[in-house]
């Protein structure tokens, strides 16, 4: 039997500390498009007591974002106060016995980068600005982090910004969506190339979502059309990573393939997020999978068996690799539901270990009730409430197999 995953907690910079006023998402809260993030969970003020509290609760690891918009609020200006703050957070975490997996990009970006300089839409953003930032972060904090995650949920980043248009730069252009997806694959690998010279391992992030075709009638053509849609989405979301990590080729349907030296077998860990499955219909509309899965207030429908399905699919496509669940969770008022989903998720990682699949770490979203872009502060998402009182779900994390 392989050792089971080490379960920790995950949070974003915005969720734990609120959005920086230099972030490109800050305008969304000012306009009322997103709920006010204020100070998030308050972690930025309470981390000196929060981290020992989490360690005492048996939590050994934390995924946390090093906020670029705080570190570099203006182009070329490295904010010493932000550097000192992040250094202190990482130092306190290490002293408490908590390993931090540091994320470099999880959605919000500095406004000067994404808006004034067109961000990753501009070739200089990918070739010059992003590598310079990665290098500086690695040099400053590399001795204090346990692992790196260059870009969290790259498919979702491209989808929201360039197809749905719900996040900066607010585009709804299928061609731009494909180009941005390609660019984020390249940006992730460029960060891996720079970070891999240091000691902490680097994890790629595949934001997974099992998709099944759905029908509203008995027409065979409808099922065929739904199946083709599923194949198209799956090729973009999952299949592109199979070509990339196995063959060294970034293959985004509709764009020219790019073979990149060193890409095959890249990254120390194949990381992934999992937040439920989806049913996709011929007309492009979606529902949860299974259809009757209860939908949480943030619109997601956790399906714990799907986590096991996803782990096995990853193991089949990336034989011999090590894996990490970079994010899974539940935003809901009912902690008994949260405990049920957490217990089921722990069971699936244990079952994978019993089958010889190496899942080194798993991260539950989140530790302490904080801000989410979908629900603001209205719906709890932590195993601790904002008063730092533990819920039943916190005891499940403590009892998770080690």
Model-derived regions: residue spans:
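Active-site region of glycoside hydrolase catalytic domains
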Residues: 1-30, 75, 87-336, 347-402
């Amino acid at each position: 039997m392989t050792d089971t995953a080490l379960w920790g907690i995950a949070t974003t910079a915005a969720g734990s500390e609120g959005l920086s006023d230099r972030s490109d998402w800050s305008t969304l809260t000012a306009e009322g498009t997103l709920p006010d993030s204020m100070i998030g969970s308050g972690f930025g003020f309470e981390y000196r007591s929060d981290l020992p509290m989490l360690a005492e609760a048996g939590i050994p690891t934390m995924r946390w974002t090093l906020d670029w918009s705080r570190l570099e609020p203006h182009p070329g200006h490295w904010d010493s106060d932000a550097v000192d703050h992040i250094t202190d957070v990482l130092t306190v975490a290490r002293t408490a016995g908590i390993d931090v997996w540091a994320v470099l990009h999880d959605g919000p970006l500095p406004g000067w980068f994404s808006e004034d300089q067109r961000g990753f839409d501009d070739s200089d953003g990918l070739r010059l600005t992003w590598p310079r930032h990665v290098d500086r972060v690695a040099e400053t904090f590399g001795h204090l982090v346990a692992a790196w995650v260059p870009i969290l949920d790259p498919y979702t980043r491209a989808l929201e910004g360039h197809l749905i248009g719900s996040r900066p730069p607010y585009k709804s252009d299928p061609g731009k969506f494909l180009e941005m997806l390609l660019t984020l694959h390249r940006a992730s690998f460029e960060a891996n190339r720079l970070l891999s010279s240091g000691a902490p391992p680097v994890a790629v992030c595949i934001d997974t979502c099992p998709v099944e075709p759905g029908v509203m009638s008995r027409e065979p053509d409808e099922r065929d059309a739904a199946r083709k849609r599923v194949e198209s989405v799956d090729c973009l979301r999952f299949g592109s990573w199979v070509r990339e990590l196995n063959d060294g080729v970034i293959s985004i349907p509709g764009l020219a393939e790019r073979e990149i030296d060193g890409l095959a077998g890249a990254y120390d860990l194949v990381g992934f997020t999992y937040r439920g499955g989806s049913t996709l219909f011929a007309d492009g509309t979606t529902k949860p999978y299974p259809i009757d899965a209860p939908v949480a207030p943030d619109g997601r429908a956790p399906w714990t068996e799907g986590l096991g399905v996803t782990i096995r699919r990853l193991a089949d496509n990336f034989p011999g690799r090590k894996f990490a669940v970079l994010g899974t969770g539940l935003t809901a008022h009912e902690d008994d539901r949260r405990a049920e989903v957490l217990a089921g998720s722990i069971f699936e990682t244990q079952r994978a270990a019993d089958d010889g699949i190496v899942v080194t770490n798993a991260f539950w979203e989140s530790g302490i009730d904080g801000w989410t872009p979908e629900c603001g502060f209205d719906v709890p998402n932590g195993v601790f409430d904002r008063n730092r009182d533990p819920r039943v779900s916190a005891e499940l994390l403590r009892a998770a197999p080690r």
